[in-house]
Each structure stands twice: as C-alpha cells, then as structure tokens.
C-alpha cells in the first residue's frame, strides 16, 4: 500500500439519521461542520429527504408508503427498512463505526432504527445508538412507542445513549417555541456523536484511537457521556465537573467499568490540572474501571479547557434510585465547587442565551452528561455548557398540563 495515502488508515465512521428526527439531526451535524464522518439519511418521507444535505439519501418508503411517511406507525417504519435491507447493507459496507440516530416515538425512526443497527452489527461495525426520548407534551402514545423502540434498539446496538427531551425544558425559558425545542434536541444529538468522533479524528498529545473507543463501547449496553468546558483558574477540574454533573441525562456514571477521558486545552495546559481532572473522574467510576485517557493540545481553545467523559459498562442502574438519592458523582462535583467556587465554572462565552451557528470545533463544547436530578445547585451553569438558543431558568413542565388531548396531537413528519 502506498504510504503517501494515510487517509486509508483512518477509521471509517458513518452517521445514519433515520426518520424525520434523525434526518434533522444529521442536517444539523452537517451545518455545524462535523468532520471525518459520512452522513446517510434514511426516510419514508421523500419530500423531507430531498431537503437533506447528507452524502447518501435512501428513500425506503417509495413502495410501501409511496414516499408519504410512516404515519407515526413503527410497524410501517420497520417494514420499510426491512424491504430495503440490501440497499441499507450496501451503504453501510466498509464502516468501522456506525452511529444510528433517531427521534424515538414516531414511525420511521422508531421502527427502522433497530433494523439499521442490526445490519450494521452484522457487517462487523461498532454500532452506537444516539436517540431522543420525546417531550411529554407529545402525548402518551408517542411516549409508549418510544419506550418500546428504545428497548428494541438496545438489543441491536453495542452501546445506546438515550437523551430525554424533557430535560431540555429544565434549562429552557418558558417562552421557548416548540420549533426551537426540537432544534435543541438536534443539538444534543450532535453533541452525542461529535463527542465520540472527536476522540478518534482529532490528533492528540496522548492519542485516543478507534481501538480505545471500541474497547470501552463494544457490547457495553447503556452509556453516559458528558462534555464540559471552562476557563480561568482550575479550568480542567471545573470542565470535568461539568462533564459529570450535567442535568440532561437520567443516571450517574457511578460504577462505570469503562471510561474514555479526553482533555483538550492550549499549550499552557498544566500537568497538575490534567491530573486533578482525571482524578475527579476516576473517583466516581468503578474502583477497577478501565480508564483510557487522552490529551489534545489545541491552541485555538485559548484559555479554555474541554473535558469529554464517556462512561459505559454498568453492572446495573436503577433510575428510580438515581433520581431520588445523591450520588458520589454529585457529591464530588459539589465538593469541587465548594473548593474552587461555583459561578466560575460557567464556560466563558456561554451566557444565558448563546448564539447558534458557530462551528462545533471552535465554539465552547456542547455538553451533556450524568447528573441526575435538576435545579439542585445554582452553581451549575444554567445552560449546562450547551450551544443552544435556550435561555435558562425555566420550571419543568407541570404534569397538570398533560391531558388526553395531547395524546392525539398529529405532529408533522419533519418533527418526528
């Protein structure tokens, strides 16, 4: 092989967005300039598919639904994907890693994502699902379909990251529009994918590669991920604190047997602060966890430090227990804030209403992670490090606003 073509040695990463929500998420990733991956859009809605800028577009509804969508019926979505199994297999060939992203609860994404994941794994690719759980206001039927879809997908992927959209409301303004809420969900899906691909595609002082990611995520089941950034004194520790204490995921990284840890900063990033950040993460993982560490020097970050934590390999996670009890991760984060000061942990440049549209590599890292519970500590940045157009400090939606009428809401396919 010609040694002048090093790109041939790079891991082949493909991101598949299936259904309206998944295709919207892929479009968002393309807009933000996510690099080093191939984008594939799959849908039963031909019109929505035409609007995608993905490298590969696959209409799986041209016979079964005549390109008109799955009508929020997961059985139709599953059948459509199975009818085009050979085409899906063809576009996934050669991939080392496949991300399957979708908005759970609709038809095409909910029913088709497990089919895509099964095909990807059968081809030998490390297969990671990154999906959203629907907002409560989308209705009980959609919620039930989402839960069934998540459980089915979990059996077909190596690792599954589930992002509950309702948690976005905890960092949203009461006046946020429904369209902006769904765009914010797309941003979180982007964060889930880029947080992993960056570890592989960005050269490091201490390198992480595809084999490192695979050793933690292959057959790992559920995974939790956090991305935090901070500036100023003790920036690496504060970034690590944000990475393990975000309000957006439903469980804690406590007891993880596998952890990927990447710390990025300028050339002045100090050994002591790297050590402190790594120690913070180590203390909340399993005592015998396989912790793989990488450090990237990027002068474009300036005074900013960025920490990415991916935790997987849990013995068992009781979400009810996590929701009601303070975890070691939370207690560690709280003690760190007490030692270093709270408000300083807000990443510089991330105000209450940050601007959308910046490049995901030059902008402060969009982050989400493992803090269960919400609104418990005013020192956590209100936007939790996310580059989304959501002003902070809103109450969670009241359960009294949920009614039978919402169960029958008919959402346009581009929001499914």
Swiss-Prot record:
Species the sequence originates in: Kocuria rhizophila (strain ATCC 9341 / DSM 348 / NBRC 103217 / DC2201)
Database matches in SUPFAM superfamilies: Tubulin C-terminal domain-like (SSF55307), Tubulin nucleotide-binding domain-like (SSF52490)
Record text on subunit structure and interactions: Homodimer. Polymerizes to form a dynamic ring structure in a strictly GTP-dependent manner. Interacts directly with several other division proteins.
Biased composition regions of type Acidic residues, renumbered to the chain: 376-392
Protein encoded by which gene: ftsZ
Protein name in the entry: Cell division protein FtsZ
Residues that hold GTP according to the record: 20-24, 107-109, 138, 142, 186
InterPro entries: Cell_div_FtsZ, Cell_div_FtsZ_CS, FtsZ/CetZ, FtsZ_C, Tub_FtsZ_C, Tubulin/FtsZ-like_C, Tubulin/FtsZ_2-layer-sand-dom, Tubulin/FtsZ_GTPase_sf
Primary subcellular site in the record, as a coarse category: cytoplasm
Family, similarity comment: Belongs to the FtsZ family.
Compositional bias of kind Polar residues: 319-335
PANTHER family assigned to the protein according to its UniProt record, in alphabetical order: CELL DIVISION PROTEIN FTSZ-RELATED, MITOCHONDRIAL DIVISION PROTEIN FSZA
GO cellular component labels: cell division site; cytoplasm
Comp. bias (Basic and acidic residues): 404-416
CDD domains reported in the protein's UniProt record: FtsZ_type1
């Amino acid at each position: 092989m010609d040694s002048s073509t090093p790109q041939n040695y790079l891991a082949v990463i493909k991101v598949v967005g299936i259904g309206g929500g998944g295709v919207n998420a892929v479009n968002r990733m393309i807009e933000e300039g996510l690099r080093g991956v191939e984008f594939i859009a799959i849908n039963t809605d031909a019109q929505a598919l035409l609007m995608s800028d993905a490298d590969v577009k696959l209409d799986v509804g041209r016979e079964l639904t005549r390109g008109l969508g799955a009508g929020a019926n997961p059985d139709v979505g599953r059948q459509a994907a199975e009818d085009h199994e050979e085409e899906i297999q063809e576009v996934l060939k050669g991939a080392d890693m496949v991300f399957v992203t979708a908005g759970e609860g609709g038809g095409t994404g909910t029913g088709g994502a497990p089919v895509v994941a099964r095909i990807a794994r059968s081809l030998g690719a490390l297969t990671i699902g990154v999906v959203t759980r629907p907002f409560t206001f989308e209705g009980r039927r959609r919620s039930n379909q989402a839960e069934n879809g998540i459980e089915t997908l979990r059996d077909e992927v190596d690792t599954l990251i589930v992002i509950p959209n309702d948690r976005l409301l905890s960092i949203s303004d009461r006046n946020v529009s429904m369209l902006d809420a769904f765009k914010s969900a797309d941003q979180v899906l982007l964060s889930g994918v880029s947080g992993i691909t960056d570890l592989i595609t960005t050269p490091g002082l201490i390198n992480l590669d595809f084999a490192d990611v695979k050793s933690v995520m292959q057959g790992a089941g559920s995974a939790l991920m956090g991305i935090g950034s901070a500036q100023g004194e003790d920036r690496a520790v504060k970034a690590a604190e944000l990475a393990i204490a975000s309000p957006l995921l439903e469980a804690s990284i406590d007891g993880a047997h596998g952890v990927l840890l990447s710390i990025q900063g300028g050339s002045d990033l100090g050994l002591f602060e790297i050590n402190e950040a790594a120690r913070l993460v180590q203390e909340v993982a399993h005592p015998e966890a396989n912790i793989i560490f990488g450090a990237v020097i990027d002068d474009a970050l300036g005074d900013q430090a960025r920490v990415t934590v991916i935790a997987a390999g849990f013995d068992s996670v009781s979400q009810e227990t996590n929701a009601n009890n303070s975890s070691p991760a939370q207690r560690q984060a709280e003690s760190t804030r007490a030692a270093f000061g709270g408000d300083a942990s807000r990443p510089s440049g991330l105000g209450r209403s940050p601007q959308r549209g910046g490049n995901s590599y030059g902008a402060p890292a969009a982050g989400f992670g493992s803090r269960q519970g919400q609104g418990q500590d005013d020192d956590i940045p209100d936007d939790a490090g996310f580059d989304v157009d959501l002003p902070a400090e809103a109450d969670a939606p009241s359960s009294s606003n949920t009614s039978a009428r919402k169960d029958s809401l008919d959402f346009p396919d581009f929001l499914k």
